[in-house]
């Protein structure tokens, strides 16, 4: 399997997922200048030779994305269910070829859907309403987080957004320990993809105690993906939706929105929060 490592800040010359284009600024319309833009390409996840989903994504940390998506969608239950991940760049996008165990591939074929996604859209292509909600085993109550450490984590979030710092165009997802230290994270133009990348990285790291921190709002699917991978606490910089709160309540996930310096709104299961 491709090696998966936590993202860290790099110099602009080393950054993948962004490139420079000529642009015109309002105050200098006659003088083209170069500016950084985030890359967005179609990424096809292909399981044992069968294309399962196409998502628009930033072309970095794609092995982590493949693993995290497979876990958060319930296609696999552990990284050991994937034997190999290989990237195949093409003219129109990137194929991520994933070799599944025969048992997991048989299960996937039963529920396979063809889904062409817009940026981070996780519902596109689902054929029936009942397919939106996946059964999630209620989470245990083994985690705790002191909000005094939240500001520390927020101050570090841009460390995993080198493309975002250049372009202002990416979402971030990070794993923070109970002391507020950012252990690693990912970025992407799509918030769901950024989260899947993080969940893929976490699956290969000894990160148990802590929480997920995302730079976006908390939709139902962000909650569902987090819970599917066993994380008990989700901090979102923006608000949560009503459906996200309902799903979090049902699966015992602690959901916190408006996670900003000096501020936090706890929606569900506050017993984990100090």
From Swiss-Prot:
A GO BP entry: Mo-molybdopterin cofactor biosynthetic process
Record's superkingdom?
Bacteria
Q: Which UniProt keywords apply?
A: Cytoplasm, Molybdenum cofactor biosynthesis
* Summary of the function given for this chain in its UniProt record: Required for formate dehydrogenase (FDH) activity. Acts as a sulfur carrier protein that transfers sulfur from IscS to the molybdenum cofactor prior to its insertion into FDH.
- Extract the InterPro entries matched here: Cytidine_deaminase-like, FdhD
> In its UniProt entry, what is this protein called?
Sulfur carrier protein FdhD
The molecular function terms of the Gene Ontology recorded here are: sulfur carrier activity; sulfurtransferase activity
**Which family would the database say this protein is a member of?**
Belongs to the FdhD family.
- Source organism per UniProt: Yersinia pseudotuberculosis serotype IB (strain PB1/+)
* Taxonomic classification: Bacteria, Pseudomonadati, Pseudomonadota, Gammaproteobacteria, Enterobacterales
The encoding gene is: fdhD
List localization entries.
Cytoplasm
NCBIfam families per the UniProt record, alphabetical: fdhD_narQ
Q: What is its main location?
A: cytoplasm
Gene Ontology CC? cytoplasm
Question: Binding of Mo-bis(molybdopterin guanine dinucleotide): at which residues?
Answer: 258-263
HAMAP family from the xrefs?
A: FdhD
